[in-house]
A protein has these predicted regions:
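Hydrophobic h-region of N-terminal signal peptides that target proteins for export
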Residues: 12-21
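Bacterial N-terminal signal peptides that target proteins for export
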Residues: 1-11
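Short microdomains enriched in Cys/His and/or Lys/Arg
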Residues: 60-70
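C-terminal capping alpha-helices of c-type cytochrome domains
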Residues: 83-127
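Sequence/structural segment immediately N-terminal to covalent heme-attachment motifs in c-type
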Residues: 24-48, 56
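Short Fe-S-cluster ligation motifs
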Residues: 68-83, 87
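Stable alpha-helical elements in mature extracytoplasmic
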Residues: 26, 33, 37, 52, ...
């Protein structure tokens, strides 16, 4: 094996765990970001909390616009046909009004890592 090739293999082996760790969502950071950015309108508690947006417990797997105790959905979101998977949430949160024109959702999370962290946190919220 040539010196350059050996150096490349060693560098890849050393860097691989660090790159994988950097790519993993940070659920605690997602929770903190949620509390700062999203918690103003959305609740993640069984009862109580803000009601400008729907409660997000169990959001992953739920059809958009279908939270039974929330009545402020836009017609656009109800008609979107979206089922909230982590992939769908990630796409939506980049720019909600571009993904679903007419949505009432005012916030976006343009940063990929921050958005991945928030989506990972939301995925932990089971009913």
């Amino acid at each position: 094996m040539s010196g350059f090739r050996r150096l490349f293999v060693v560098a890849a082996a050393v860097m691989s765990p660090a790159l994988c760790a950097a790519a993993r969502p940070d659920i605690e950071n997602g929770k903190a970001t949620f509390n700062t950015m999203c918690g103003v309108c959305h609740s993640v508690q069984k009862e109580g909390g803000p009601h400008e947006g729907p409660n997000l417990i169990g959001v992953v797997g739920r059809k958009a616009g279908s939270q039974p105790d929330f009545s402020k959905y836009s017609a656009a979101l109800k008609a979107s046909g979206i089922t909230w998977s982590t992939k769908a949430l990630n796409k939506f949160l980049v720019s909600p009004w571009e993904r679903v024109p007419g949505t009432f959702m005012p916030m976006q999370i343009p940063d990929d890592k921050t958005r991945a962290d928030v989506v990972a946190f939301l995925a932990t919220l089971k009913e």
